[in-house]
């Protein structure tokens, strides 16, 4: 049967009420709690070579109540100077994460400004019935293939549509490969909730 669960927790940014066939429909645009880190610009200098990326993230978010940065993998030293100049905390953290080749992923199960530095460590899950699937290829393969030994198959990914609710970082088996849920899109279509996932290998 159907199960209840939270699809998104955050803050309403825009609300529009409209009437359609005698029904009143609310169109709500919401943003995650990390919006609280994207309000004001700050200036900071981090110049100790022994400092770590998580240490910097903790310093940057310290003034924002209930904020938390979660690192699924191993922490690393920066080995150099990082400067935040006239940037919001969120923009600076995104730029810092890009140096590690990692995304910043908001935790949308809370309305607090919680986020992951890299994809969260998910669970082994089942896709369930697949409505449709499109194959895609990550063009970054051509940028790195000449610099190191990489498997072209690791850069093949799938956009899968299903009714099963998964979380970013969850692992599924598809086409004989164990893949990660690296993107998630939720839609209400024909009165039911539909999910589109980008399934990719560890190199994505």
Provide a role label for each language-model segment.
Residues 1-204:
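Amphipathic alpha-helical and helix-coil boundary elements used as assembly
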């Amino acid at each position: 049967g159907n199960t209840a669960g939270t699809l998104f927790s955050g803050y309403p940014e825009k609300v529009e009420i409209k009437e359609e066939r005698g029904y009143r429909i609310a169109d709500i645009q919401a943003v995650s709690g990390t919006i609280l880190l994207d309000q004001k610009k700050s200036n900071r200098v981090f110049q100790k070579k022994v400092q770590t990326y998580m240490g910097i993230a903790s310093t940057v978010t310290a003034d924002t109540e209930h904020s938390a940065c979660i690192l699924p993998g191993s922490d690393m030293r920066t080995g150099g100077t990082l400067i935040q100049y006239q940037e919001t905390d969120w923009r600076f953290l995104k730029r810092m994460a890009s140096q590690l080749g990692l995304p910043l992923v908001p935790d949308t199960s809370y309305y607090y400004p919680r986020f992951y530095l890299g994809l969260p460590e998910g669970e082994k899950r089942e896709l369930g019935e697949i409505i449709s699937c499109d194959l895609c290829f990550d063009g970054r393969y051509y940028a790195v293939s000449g610099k190191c030994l990489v498997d072209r198959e690791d850069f093949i990914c799938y956009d899968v549509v299903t009714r099963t609710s998964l979380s970013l970082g969850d692992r599924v088996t598809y086409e004989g490969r164990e893949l990660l849920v690296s993107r998630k899109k939720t839609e209400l279509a024909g009165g039911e909730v539909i999910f589109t996932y980008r399934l990719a290998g560890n190199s994505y």
